[in-house]
Each structure stands twice: as C-alpha cells, then as structure tokens.
A protein has these predicted regions:
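Conserved phosphate/pyrophosphate-binding and hydrolysis machinery centered on Walker-type P-loop NTPases
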Residues: 194, 198, 328, 377, ...
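P-loop NTPase Walker
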Residues: 1-39, 43, 191-310, 669
C-alpha cells in the first residue's frame, strides 16, 4: 500500500472524490448561470435585429456584423451546453482510475485521475481529472508499476509508476477502491463482465486492455482491419477509437465526417449511446444494402429484393446452382465481365447524328472527336451532356448571348436521341444476355423488382455509366462492421465511393455465407493504400462453458478465453413445439436476476410463430424483425442473423433443420450471444402454423 504524501488529499481517493464532487457542482452552477446569461444576450440580439433591420446600412455591413455576433453567442452557448452534459455525466462517476507517476528528475509523484472527460476548476487550469484519451492516460492502460513513459505533444516523457488504483463509483458514491499491480486487474474485468447485460452496448473505458488500447490509440495506419473473435470487444474498440480520434483531431475531424456501415437498425440503436456517453456527438449510420436500394430506385428499378429474403430462401430451399450464380455475380470475375461489356458498349449504345442550331453545326466527325477524345474520362451516359454543354458554350461565346431555356430543352432532346437507350436496367440485361445468363423481366420501371443477386452488380454498372454518388465527399473516416458479410464487389464499390481512412472489423466465423470468406486475403490488394490487419483472439463475453461449446460448433480452437465460469450449456430435444413452449414458459416465468434474454431461431417464420405462441401463454415478448429499430429489456425473440453483434444474459437457441446450409453458422452465432446461460433446443416436428 502506498503511504507517501499522506497529508495530500489528492492521494486519498475518497477525500479526492468528495472534493471533486463539490467542485463539479460549483462548475455546473457557474455554467448554468452563464447559459442563462447567454440566452438573454441571444434574445436581446434577436429583438434588436427585428426592431432595427430596416434602418441598417444599405450595404449590409451592420446586418452582417449582427448576424456574426449572434452566431458567435449561439455557438458559445452550445459549447457550454455540451460541457454541462459532460459534467453531469461525470457527477455520477467522476473517475475510475489513478496513476501515481514520478517524472525522471522529480522527488515527488504526481497523481493523475482518469475519467470520461477532462475536468478543471476553471478553464485553462491544470485538470483535476484527465480524459481517458489524454496522452498521460495511456500510463493507466499500458503499464504495470515500474518504469513507464508516454508521448506528450512536446515529446516523450519518462518516469516511474509508483502505484495504480482502480475505482468504482456509482451515483457519486465510492463502491470500491484498491491498488492494482496489473494493467486492468482480471478480477475487476471478470466482475464487470459478470454483470447483467443491458439493452445498450457498454462503454469499456474502465477495462480497456493493453492490446485494445493500442488499436484505439492507433493514428498512424490509414486503414485498420480488425479480425476479432465473437465477444472480443471489436465493435467497442472501433467506437472508442472513433472517440479517441475525435478528441485528438478535433480541429479537423467532426462527428459529421464519420460514417458507420452497420448491419441493421437494431444493431445501430444498440451502439448509438456509446459516443454521447464518452462526451462526443453521435455519428451517422447506414446499412449499405438500404443505401443501394435507395440509389437504384432513382430511375433503375422501383423495388429490390431484401437481403434477408434471399437469406431466408437459401435456408428453406437450398439450391447449389443458385448459390453459385450469386457468388459469381459478386466476384472479381463478374466485375471483369462488366468491364469487358463496357469496353464494347459504346458502339452499340451511340448513334452519332449531325447537330445544327441557328447557324452553327456539329458534324458527326466533330461529335466523335469530342465524345471519344475530349470527354473520354466522363462516364458514358453523362458524356453526351458534356458534349452538349460544350456546344452551347461555343454558340453563346460566338453569338454573344445566352440560349433560351426552350432551346436548351430542344438541344437536350437532340443529344439524348443519339443514345439507343439510357435505361441502365435495359443495358444490364444486354450484359446478362452476352454472359449467357437468364434475363431480368422486361417490364416498366414501376413493376421492376431486382433480385438481390443483381442489386450490387446493377449499382456497379450504374456508377460506371453515370458516375458515383458524391454526397459522401465530406466523410473522412468510414467504419465497416461485419466485414465478413461484404462481397468483393461491395468492397469495390465502397472503395470507389470513399477515399478516406477506414476502420474495418468483423469475424470470419460469423459469416452469413455457406463458406467462410476471409476478406483479409483480398482487402490489402483491393484497397491499395496504407492498410494494417490486426487479429484479436481473446474473447471476453461468454463464460468458459459457453465459449468451449461455441468452439466445438465452429471448429475455431485457438482463442484465448477469460477464466469466468458459469452454468454448463443445456442441450435438449423435444417431440413437439408444445413441449418446447412448456419448457420456455417455465424458464421465463422465473427469470431470476437476468435483465435480458433471447429466444433465437434460424428463420423469420420460426421467430414469428414462437413469439405469437408465447404471447398466447401470457409471456411478455419483444419480437425483433428486419423492420425493428430497437430492442428492450426482457425477452427478445429474433433470428440469428439479426442477433449478430448483440448480447444477452440468457439465450435459448432453437436449432434449425439439418439440411439448412447455414446451420453451423447459425448455431455459432446463437451460442456466442450468451453472457451467462445458454440453452440449445431442438424439436422433432415443425412449429404450429
């Protein structure tokens, strides 16, 4: 036990907590008063503006000055409001760690308390509590007692860690405090992981491990690819990395510059609170599938088959030839087919016709020269527009006047008529015909529904013919979750859309394909930029009993497992669905101390039927399907593919049919959702319809 500086309250966690809570309260009162004064100032400015704007100078200088002053005050109030929210969060648990560090050349150690944010008595003063992302905080995560160093803005600072402390504070009360010899004590880690699951992903600032910290604080690698086992904390690591980057690059990187590609809305809701909890604004999230559907509804097809419909069909009606066709259409080889088709498309698509307009002529030879040489870099379906604009600019320059809107529309029609068609759906069918594939139905736009296997090939063709979507140019960091479920074609499209830093994460064992796809084999070559791959083999989520069971299902046996024990996995077979329901009702009416439970099925039909039957038995059920946007405490009934990324205290997994090609993946994903208890059930007869 450390006993230096016994008269300095900074080395007494309980005394320091009492002191810092008083100072936090005082700062909150000051900020509250400042916010009130600022709002009065804003109200006065707005009142002055509306009373006097008609008398302001004709050049608008006074108007501009007033608007700028108002904007400055609004921004100042917003910053204070964010600070207020952070301090209110800190009041509940101001800090969770402390490092007593003695710099080389000093005689006395300096205590550094670590929390979710910086806190000082006054702006500009030395912090009493340091943000977990601050350079000095790396001492807490990366070192034991003894020699240590950290990288400060001025350079590396060396010294010695004399002691490290870990604290748990709830509602402003100290629950425990102890001196730790290790980085993050295993007992603390097991205690944290042994608590019940919530309906939201937990932040991990109190228990970040050394290998996790290295990933979070990585700023050197432009593209970071993380292969992490189920329960390794890879999603938490990615979100904490984003929080770290937002903190250290706050002058150039904002929340609006970051985009997460997540698998579904339920998962997006599950992770949505992490960044606000860490003191940052939330970031944009989208599903790449939904993005593709939206893009293709712009003039290509009125509807697209949902990915989950395609997945359900594969499970219910296994068809090897259909799966092979799907795989081929998402492959590098099929991209080659599209590119080969595009190379010869121009002759088939364009018929040049001389343009004459009010004394100015564009001959076929002129058109060919402009189309094939001057504007060769312009996408094919946009190229004639470039030629038209060139012609109009030339005419207006020669004549010294502008062309009327009616004449512009007439010229647009003339240039458009040189295309045999501009319908990408029709052009895609030409390509399918050239490849010897079955064609899509030749129907009007409003009756078109793209099979899922054609969604991303069609999107790729659209972007090659018309150019990509430029609305994401402000994105400076892209996070891709569940990387194993993206195809080569999807990564190719993403690479063309986003020229930015990336954090890509997933687990090859949780693929939604019949074969494990190791994207690490092709990502370095495809992305062709600075890329680093990291594999995390330590799993924290499950008890040892559940983790060992999951290993048997997946065949993955090289994981490092936390030595946290619990109940053995229960496997049970029932003759009818009635017997299964009796068993479930018995468990669910006596849930014990668990806050979250899940009944996870293979197919959507099974999930829907079971949720309906359980409701008839008086069980409170939250049914989660592809259209859900959140899940609640209590019992969730859903499919394995929607449960990916989530965790529950207790899981009841229903085995699928033996002929289901995704049976093993489904069982592995179900098993690895369980924190404390896992029941694996099977029924001989199909569920009641």
């Amino acid at each position: 036990m450390t006993n230096y500086n016994s008269n300095d309250n900074r080395f007494n966690g309980r005394c320091f907590l009492e002191d810092v809570e008083i100072k936090l309260q005082k700062r909150l009162e000051e900020i509250g008063q400042s916010l009130s004064d600022g709002q009065k100032e804003i109200d006065n400015m707005q009142e002055y503006y509306w009373e006097n704007y008609t008398e302001m100078d004709e050049y608008g200088y006074e108007d501009y000055d007033n608007q700028q002053a108002l904007l400055h005050q609004v921004n100042a109030n917003n910053e204070k409001l964010q600070l207020k929210h952070r301090f209110e969060k800190m009041l509940d648990a101001p800090f969770f760690g402390r490092v007593d560090f003695m710099y080389d050349g000093d005689d006395e150690p300096e205590p550094f308390y670590i929390g979710i944010g910086n806190f000082a008595e006054k702006t500009g003063m030395q912090p009493l509590i340091y943000d977990w992302r601050a350079p000095v905080s790396s001492l807490f995560y990366d070192y034991d007692k003894g020699p240590a160093s950290y990288e400060a803005p001025a350079g590396r600072l060396d010294g010695e860690i004399l002691s490290k402390w870990q604290f748990k504070i709830q509602n402003g009360e100290l629950v425990y405090a102890f001196e730790s010899d290790t980085k993050i004590d295993d007992d603390i880690l097991k205690k944290e992981l042994g608590t019940n699951s919530d309906v939201k992903l937990k932040n991990i600032v109190r228990t970040i491990q050394k290998e996790q910290n290295a990933i979070i604080r990585n700023t050197k690698d432009r593209i970071l690819v993380i292969q992490g086992a189920a329960g390794s904390g890879k999603t938490s690591i990615a979100l904490h990395r984003i929080a770290y980057l937002l903190y250290h690059e706050r002058d150039t990187l904002k929340s609006s510059n970051i985009l997460i590609l997540s698998p579904n809305s339920v998962f997006a809701d599950y992770i949505s609170h992490i960044l606000p909890e860490l003191g940052e604004e939330n970031i944009r999230e989208m599903s790449f599938d939904l993005y593709a559907y939206k893009e293709l509804r712009k003039g290509v097809a009125a509807d697209c088959e949902d990915r989950y419909d395609q997945l359900e069909r594969r499970m219910k009606f296994p068809d090897e030839s259909a799966q092979n066709r799907f795989d081929w259409k998402q492959s590098k080889d099929f991209i080659g087919e599209i590119e080969g088709f595009l190379a010869i498309l121009e002759d088939r698509l364009i018929e040049f016709k001389e343009i004459e307009f009010r004394g100015m002529t564009l001959t076929e030879e002129d058109l060919i020269q402009l189309f094939y040489y001057k504007f060769t870099e312009t996408p094919l379906l946009k190229r004639m527009d470039a030629v038209k604009d060139y012609f109009i600019d030339s005419w207006e320059t020669l004549k010294g006047r502008n062309i009327s809107e009616d004449d512009q529309e007439m010229l647009q029609m003339k240039f458009d008529k040189m295309y045999t068609t501009k319908d990408i759906y029709t052009i895609y069918n030409w390509m399918l015909d050239d490849c010897g594939c079955d064609l899509l139905l030749e129907v009007p736009y409003e009756k078109r529904k793209l099979p899922y296997e054609d969604v991303f090939p069609m999107l790729y063709l659209k972007y090659r013919l018309s150019g990509g979507n430029s609305t994401h140019k402000n994105i400076k960091h892209l996070v891709i979750d569940e990387m194993q479920d993206y195809t080569y074609l999807q990564y190719t499209i993403l690479e063309s859309l986003f020229h930015c830093r990336m954090t890509i994460l997933g687990d090859r064992a949780q693929t939604l394909d019949t074969k494990q796809q190791d994207v690490l084999r092709f990502l370095p070559k495809l992305l062709g930029r600075e890329i680093r791959t990291i594999e995390i083999k330590k799993s924290y989520r499950n008890t040892l009993e559940i983790a060992r069971y999951a290993e048997k299902v997946s065949g993955v046996s090289d994981l490092e497992l936390l030595d946290r024990h619990g109940k053995e996995v229960v496997e049970k077979t029932f003759n009818t669905d009635t017997e299964l329901l009796d068993e479930l009702v018995c468990h669910l009416k006596c849930p014990g101390d668990f806050e979250t439970a899940a009944l996870i099925t293979t197919t959507e039909e099974e999930a829907f039927d079971l949720s309906r039957l359980l409701k008839l038995r008086g069980i409170n059920v939250s049914y989660v399907d592809r259209n859900s946007s959140a899940f609640k405490k209590g019992l969730t009934v859903t499919t394995f593919y929607l449960a990916k990324g989530l965790e529950f205290d207790q899981v009841f997994a229903l085995r699928g049919a033996k002929e289901n090609p995704l049976k093993n993946q489904a069982e592995y994903i179900c098993a690895t959702r369980a924190l404390h208890e896992l029941y694996v059930y099977e029924i001989a007869d199909s569920l009641s319809k």
